[in-house]
């Protein structure tokens, strides 16, 4: 995208938002912040809006709006404060911005990400649920509007870089020619060497202690269970039109190789770099040009060795369940994600033992499989099913 970009950073107070604003600040002649959004950290949102000169902030409710005003500097004019979920979606589609960083965690980020796609924006997609829960709807919106879709997850960004995509980012309907398979790497998280028995008494702080990446608590737990990698398998299916049996996962504890693409001639292309989200973010902002993101160079001699291994599905049942959901269809993927969000929230609150996260997901998938089939042609259909699964998971007596 040439010219000055006006950017809406949705989920600006999270780790992806922080990294995005860091990259934007390096290029004031190329990028400006139009809008920011946050759910709870109004002090931080106010500081970000002051620093960037954002014209708009979006907050979840009137109470948050009051807290934002209280945190604001009296010497500066207030930005426009928009309130609620509809305001968030409207901002993503706003003519005032060209590019949307969709970095809100969970299903809550889906409507705004979809609105950005429907309005033909450059969409920097860091919200997994847009594709996991609504892949068909989302990719159809990208095709119909002509939006640019650039994946920001380090694994999908790596695959995108290794594919012959040319100068355009969109929504393919068939796999790239001559590509045999996609290989997503995973660190294995903090419990890579733990037996299933060792996981009975895992605490939230232990699960959130990721060895390589700095992330929020929910996604850190997802990384520990490898449900995060399962969601990324589903994402890869939609982003690259690749069937499940041509998407593999490799544990790579150093997180230096971010993903690989294997071609029909036996060649394997890998994208490597420091485990720093500013690299994929800068790639998305600057595409097709590469920008200096402030990331230190990769010193392979210093690393010395890189290790790879096949994931143990007994240790990581959530990865197995994710493949099962992808093969079962979109409704199962909605159930997978919704049940996981309920289970992880309960675990983080101390109400659910760590091993029961997978059990809640498994039970929800069985429940969904036993129900009449549903049509998921519209966002309202997806959100209705999501709510039903959440209610079921919350009433299991487990969450």
From Swiss-Prot:
Mn(2+) binds at residues 153, 155, 232. Its EC number is 1.1.1.267. Its cofactor is Mg(2+); Mn(2+). GO terms for biological process: isopentenyl diphosphate biosynthetic process, methylerythritol 4-phosphate pathway involved in terpenoid biosynthetic process. Pathway: Isoprenoid biosynthesis; isopentenyl diphosphate biosynthesis via DXP pathway; isopentenyl diphosphate from 1-deoxy-D-xylulose 5-phosphate: step 1/6. 1-deoxy-D-xylulose 5-phosphate binds at residues 128, 154-155, 187, 210, 223, 228-229, 232. It catalyses: 2-C-methyl-D-erythritol 4-phosphate + NADP(+) = 1-deoxy-D-xylulose 5-phosphate + NADPH + H(+). Keywords: Isoprene biosynthesis, Manganese, Metal-binding, NADP, Oxidoreductase. PANTHER family: 1-DEOXY-D-XYLULOSE 5-PHOSPHATE REDUCTOISOMERASE, 1-DEOXY-D-XYLULOSE 5-PHOSPHATE REDUCTOISOMERASE, CHLOROPLASTIC. Catalyzes the NADPH-dependent rearrangement and reduction of 1-deoxy-D-xylulose-5-phosphate (DXP) to 2-C-methyl-D-erythritol 4-phosphate (MEP). This is 1-deoxy-D-xylulose 5-phosphate reductoisomerase. It comes from Bordetella avium (strain 197N). The lineage of its organism: Bacteria, Pseudomonadati, Pseudomonadota, Betaproteobacteria, Burkholderiales.
């Amino acid at each position: 995208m040439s010219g000055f970009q006006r950017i809406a950073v949705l989920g600006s107070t999270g780790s992806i938002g922080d990294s995005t604003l860091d990259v934007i600040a390096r290029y004031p002649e190329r990028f400006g912040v139009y809008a920011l959004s946050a759910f709870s950290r109004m002090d931080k949102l106010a500081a970000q809006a002051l620093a960037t000169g954002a014209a708009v902030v979006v907050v979840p409710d009137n109470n948050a709006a009051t807290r934002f005003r209280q945190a604001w500097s009296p010497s500066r004019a207030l930005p426009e404060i928009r309130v609620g979920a509809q305001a968030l979606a409207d901002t993503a589609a706003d003519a005032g911005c060209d590019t949307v960083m969709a970095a809100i965690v969970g299903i809550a980020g889906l409507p705004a990400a979809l609105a950005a796609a429907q309005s033909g924006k450059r969409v920097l997609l860091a919200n997994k649920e847009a594709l996991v829960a609504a892949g068909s709807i989302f990719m159809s919106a990208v095709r119909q509007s002509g939006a640019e879709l650039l994946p920001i997850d380090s694994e999908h960004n790596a695959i995108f870089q290794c594919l012959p995509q040319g100068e355009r980012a969109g929504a393919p309907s068939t796999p790239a020619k001559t590509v045999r398979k996609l290989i997503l790497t995973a660190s294995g998280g903090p419990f890579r060497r733990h037996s299933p028995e060792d996981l009975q008494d895992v605490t939230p702080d232990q699960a959130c202690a990721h060895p390589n990446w700095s992330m929020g608590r929910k996604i850190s737990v997802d990384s520990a269970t490898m449900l995060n990698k399962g969601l990324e398998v589903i994402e890869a299916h939609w982003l690259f039109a690749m069937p499940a049996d041509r998407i593999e996962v490799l544990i790579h504890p150093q997180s230096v190789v971010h993903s690989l693409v294997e071609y029909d001639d036996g060649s394997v292309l890998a994208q490597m770099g420091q485990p720093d989200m500013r690299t994929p973010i800068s790639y998305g902002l600057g595409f097709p040009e590469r920008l200096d993101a402030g990331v230190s160079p990769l010193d392979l001699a210093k690393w010395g060795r890189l290790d790879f291994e096949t994931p143990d599905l007994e240790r990581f049942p959530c990865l197995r369940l994710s493949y099962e959901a992808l093969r079962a269809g979109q409704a199962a993927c909605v159930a997978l994600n919704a049940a996981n969000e309920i289970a992880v929230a309960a675990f983080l609150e101390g109400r659910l033992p760590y091993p029961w996260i997978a059990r809640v997901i498994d039970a929800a998938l069985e429940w969904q499989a036993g129900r009449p089939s549903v049509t998921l042609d519209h966002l309202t259909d997806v959100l209705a099913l999501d709510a039903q699964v959440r209610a079921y998971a919350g009433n299991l007596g487990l969450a």
